[in-house]
Amino acid sequence: MQHTTSLRHRVSAARTAAVLAFGTLAVAGAAMAQNYSPELIEKGRYLATASDCIACHTATKTKPMAGGHSISSPVGDIVATNITPSKSHGIGNYSEQQFADALRKGVRADGAQLYPAMPYTAFSLFTNEDVHAMYAYFMEGVKPVDEAPKATTSLPFPMNVRASMIGWNLLFANDKPFEPDPAQTPEWNRGAYLALGAGHCVTCHTPRGAMMQELASKSMSGAQIGAWYAPDITNSKTHGIGSWSVDELTTYLTTGHLPGKSQAAGPMAEAITHSFSQLNETDLRAISTYILSVPSHKPEDPAQRNRFAHGQATDATAGFRGTSFAEGMKQSGTALGAQIFTANCASCHGASGQGTQDSYYPALFGKSITGEANPSNLIAAILNGVDRETPKGGHVFMPPFGDQTNAMVPLKNEEVAALSNFLLTSYGNSAVSVTADQVQVIREGGAKSSLVLLARVGMAVGAVVVLLLLVLLAKKRGRARRR
């Protein structure tokens, strides 16, 4: 009887344990596959759009967020990973905390460090509520793609040691969420939150130091990003965009085009197409309000023209009309540039560089691309062209003249330099000139950082110091033994 009772107790205990275990698994399963509200998922989608995730993490339009896009950096190319909710190749197994750590701290679920090409230094400003919304979107609003990018990140030593980012993060990363400034308006604070966090404007527009860290003392004052130059967007009327109004900046962020001042190309065109143009007007005006309040870090010079005030309509081609193309191409300098312009550019931009009346083909004078002291964007636009979608189904296109398979007329470095100098002399900042060597640097994706070399030298010096210390220690021990 005692044996039977004991057996019953054991069976009952086993059943209870099974029920508890099943309940625990059910709760865990529910945590992994929650049914988020449509409103929360939509909020997350909006924040992901504001963060421009799709621009870097999409190589093929039919597979959004599946990774594979190569990002050019001064230390090498970094390949964006699959961030779809795929459980085999994406982030489908990430918990919300792991997702938050990747987004705000640059730490993957496996503990490996991300490179700051992923702007976690800016995304650290996200609030917990917004991270929660983004997690909901990526888990339930993005279609999983069960394949890995064909290419992977392969940086030179020692940058390929991801653990090296731990020290960098301790020195330069921010780990505090955004704190509103009580002295500012709600609109300004909303704009600051979006511009500094999701929009990560500082990531591109702020120059970097020897360790590739953002120089806070020069925030938004302009920086080289690969082949392109992200210009000064402080409120300086001489160096930045202080001459713009909130309405004008909002228009530019919406369309990528501000007649008489600027036309988006390169990474900024991508940001406008995939991100800014998709935001609501209230947020765009808030961003504009904040950006136009960012102080300049350079002294104002009323006598100096800003980059939007150079050049005028000039028919600089009249002097060689009647000359054959073959003869014209034998010229050098700006004369060669004028021939190239007439043959390849004037049909769209006009013989006087005036563009079209509707500005679909923009004027070449009074624009940042020809007025900027740094000619990188002019060179990059010639080599790479412009190809972007605009709101309401529009399309901006300029053919490339580099070495792409779809280049209309592949131009040599000397020819690109000649064309650039003709454009600068005729329609832009004539104090700026371009060399064939500069063109080659832009053709290769921009100047490379000396950080890799510095790191290797530092490691070599460190190894020598350690070796010397070991030798000295060995000698000291040898003397002690002889005594």
Write out the residue ranges for each language-model feature.
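Short, low-complexity patches enriched in S/T/P/G
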Residues: 446-457
